UniProtKB/Swiss-Prot annotation:
UniProt source species: Alternaria alternata
Record carries keyword Transmembrane helix: no
UniProt xrefs under InterPro entries: AB_hydrolase_fold (IPR029058), Epoxide_hydro_N (IPR010497)
Name this protein carries in UniProt: Putative epoxide hydrolase AFT8
Note: Gene clusters encoding host-selective toxins (HSTs) are localized on conditionally dispensable chromosomes (CDCs), also called supernumerary chromosomes, where they are present in multiple copies. The CDCs are not essential for saprophytic growth but controls host-selective pathogenicity.
Family: Belongs to the peptidase S33 family.
Gene3D superfamilies in the cross-refs: alpha/beta hydrolase
Biological or metabolic pathway of the protein: Mycotoxin biosynthesis
Pfam families: EHN
Keyword Transmembrane helix: no
Name of the gene encoding the protein in the UniProt record: AFT8
Biological classification of the source: Eukaryota, Fungi, Dikarya, Ascomycota, Pezizomycotina
The entry's keywords: Hydrolase, Virulence
């Protein structure tokens, strides 16, 4: 593999290479717990999503139990890892932020920030990084600087320590990630488009939108979304806010949970990798009983368990509303953002009819594409499509800035 380790000379921080190895006693404990922990009986409810079904659940558990951790660590370390100190501009806390990166040596490379969802990790994007290195085997040909951070409190990134209310979690994380990009030399006024492009999915969209709306350093937004959003908006008879709310309601945790209930759930999740699998697996909406996507979901769960990410991040995840109906409508209609900040959306049909049935995006947004498939596992299951969409969207962004 070519070297993608040339950190731009404009970087203000001092990222250092990061290595890790999971201790054998912890690996043995993980395997032992998986062997001893039974699966529960199938729930009588017919509302379970695909990844909550016992067969899917059992397959994922068995994959984790049989992991060859020498091979898995080799996969995780296939791309350069870094840590860097980032000072939170509110409160002054110095955080260690972990990220995986592919740095281009092209003077025209555009920085792209890939944000994982609250139930996932940087591992989610390893498939995309593989596609980038296969398509662009030389660092001088790579059109992007690709930055994949671990959110504060996840995996190898330290958590925010200051008191914050639930509504501020996305805003706090966005502030830290924007400062990371500025420290790497990708802030406003830098070469190319004068900043960076942010990409996310359904459950990280609010954070992406916050970056695009609040920070001049973020110059454009791209997201993978469920075709249900577009389908609902175009069939709602004009009452788009209520229509979008009905879609989002399926993704939101109950709002009436009190702190005691959240703490109990947090405790339950943190006691077993099987409990963690139930939480994370249910969010991927996967119907695959085997395959690469299932294996990557199992690896994400095991990685969280090995790094004690839960309970660090689990309480946050249960408090986050993915996005308000009003904000989602703003993204789809490209309102609330500066006119020169393009928005690109890749819609996935996900049971809403064929991709061709999803009409073009609402007037005002800059770019859209339509695909068959599941947006929650698109970066795992269809990484080539996501890379292709990013390339197409960013080329258009570059034209607007040329």
């Amino acid at each position: 593999m070519a070297s993608y380790k040339n950190i731009p000379s404009t970087a203000k921080g001092s990222p250092i290479s990061f290595d890790f190895s999971f201790p054998q006693p912890k690996l043995d404990h993980l395997r032992q717990v998986l062997e001893l922990h039974p699966l529960g009986r199938e729930a009588p409810s017919k509302t379970l999503r695909g990844s909550s079904k016992p067969q899917w659940f059992g397959n994922a558990k068995e994959i984790m139990r049989r992991f060859d951790w020498a091979a898995e660590e080799e996969l995780l370390k296939a791309f350069p890892h870094y840590v860097v100190g980032v000072e939170d501009t509110i409160g002054g806390q110095m955080l260690q932020v972990h990220f995986v990166a592919l740095f281009s040596t092209s003077p025209d490379a555009i920085p792209v920030l890939l944000i994982h969802s609250w139930f996932s990790s940087y591992v989610e994007y390893l498939c995309l990084l593989s596609v980038f290195t296969e398509r662009f085997p030389q660092a001088c040909d790579l059109p992007f600087h690709v930055i994949v951070p671990s959110l504060p409190g996840y995996d190898f990134s330290s958590p925010l320590s200051r008191e914050t209310n639930n509504a501020q979690i996305n805003e706090d994380n966005a502030r830290v990630l924007n400062q990371l990009m500025v420290n790497l030399g990708f802030g406003a006024g830098s070469g190319g488009i004068g900043g960076y492009v942010v990409h996310g999915g359904v459950s990280s969209l609010r954070m992406c939108y916050t970056l695009a709306k609040e920070y001049k350093d973020c110059r454009a937004l791209h997201a993978n979304l469920d075709g249900a959003y577009r389908h609902t908006l175009t069939s709602s008879g004009g009452d788009e806010f209520e229509a979008v709310k009905s879609v989002l309601a399926e993704l939101h945790p109950p709002e009436d949970w009190d702190s005691h209930e959240r703490d109990m759930i947090r405790l339950a999740i943190s006691t077993s990798p099987v409990s963690l699998l139930a939480l994370i697996g249910s969010q991927f909406f996967g119907e695959q009983e085997q395959g690469a996507a299932l294996r990557m979901v199992a690896l994400i769960v095991a990685h969280h368990w090995m790094t004690d990410t839960y309970p660090d991040a689990s309480q946050e995840s249960y408090c986050i509303k993915d996005m308000s109906a009003e904000d989602l409508s703003h993204v789809l209609k490209h309102t609330g953002l500066e006119p020169n900040k393009p928005v690109g959306i890749s819609f996935f049909s996900h049971g809403q009819g064929s991709a061709s049935d999803i009409r073009p995006i609402v007037d005002g947004s800059s770019w859209s594409s339509r695909h068959e498939g599941n947006p929650f596992v698109a970066v795992l299951d269809q990484p080539n499509q996501t890379v292709g969409d990013l390339l197409g969207f960013v080329r258009q962004v570059q034209k607007q800035h040329s």
